């Protein structure tokens, strides 16, 4: 039988067909590094009529009225991330991409983009409509011409979902070492950081409901985690002294949250990977939601704090671990090679049957 030669031929043909982009892969951005990279991460769908000052990642579809992205000039991403990444489709009103930030879209751009500022690069897996190219570089149909394009985006989403779920869970198991006290209508958070600069608070949604003001004393803490239990969360408190770039060091973790509503300007990064959220005012910091209806701005002051080790193993302000390690997922290049190899094998076997018949 010629079965083995056919397999070898198919795999060899597949290896020749694989593009360099398919055969290579960069290190995934996961865990706390995702909060450092993106101003807003929505693992599912984002409906927006507002704006994001930094970078945005959407794991599902982007819809809603006209919205704005990367409205503040940003240093170039060391990992090459554009101002806007959407794994699914872009629908609704025109989306404004600013400061030459560019976009990557796995599906179709039905709404159209306004490409403002310096020349931008837009990569689209499907079709793009209602967009004036001018001096910009707009590539569409990449889902057909490069199989790795859409596969890579889907795997990027899967790794973010896995690692951010794990990060929220791990943070939720950290032992509290700092003091929360209610003083009249005010909740006072007094950080008592450990040797690694980590301060941890543990409160409930009921505790938040009892107060109308929030005050922080960070006391030199590099990383502050506020674990909040409860499924339904209302964030309607005022921050004494303003939001004050709290999001660079403070993470509000909602590991149990299913619904979150933000009605006041919120200080601190938010980690709620399973929550359906709605914002009516700005958040200063990074934010992670399951799905989001956005009517309030996202302000930079994204997370810059230290890393958090696994519970029981201490914490780290540096090092290689950023917390929330994802469940391993095969690299896009391996999937592409496997798929092309199988396709070549099937074709070869069918050709042999036709020849022998």
Identify the residue ranges that each predicted region occupies.
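A short, hydrophobic C-terminal helix/tail in secreted or cell-surface proteins
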Residues: 330-348
